[in-house]
Amino acid sequence: MAEEILNREYEVEYGGKRYWLRPSKAWVLQPPGKPGVVIALFKLPDGRTVRKAIMRLPP
């Protein structure tokens, strides 16, 4: 599952522009008692790094 997430391109909106990027890193964030989400880091063409939730996990 991890390889599928990292090899897929996601739409990232930043500064009014939209990019189709592959994540450089992804992890699961799951607070106690709540459903989890997959968070990913994306490197923009201008060198900035942004974080975005890309998937919700079932409870």
Swiss-Prot record:
Pfam family, one: Cren7
Main location: cytoplasm
Keyword annotations of the record: Chromosome, Cytoplasm, DNA-binding, Methylation
Post-translational modification: Methylated at multiple sites, to varying extents.
GO MF term list: double-stranded DNA binding
Keyword Protein biosynthesis (UniProt): no
Transmembrane parts of this sequence: none
Cell wall biogenesis/degradation recorded as keyword: no
Localization terms from the record: Chromosome; Cytoplasm
GO cellular component: chromosome; cytoplasm
Highest taxon above the source species: Archaea
InterPro entries associated with the record: Cren7_sf, dsDNA-bd_Cren7
Role this protein plays: A chromatin protein, binds double-stranded DNA without sequence specificity. Constrains negative DNA supercoils.
Family statement drawn from the similarity comment of this UniProt entry: Belongs to the Cren7 family.
Subunit relationships: Monomer.
Protein name: Chromatin protein Cren7
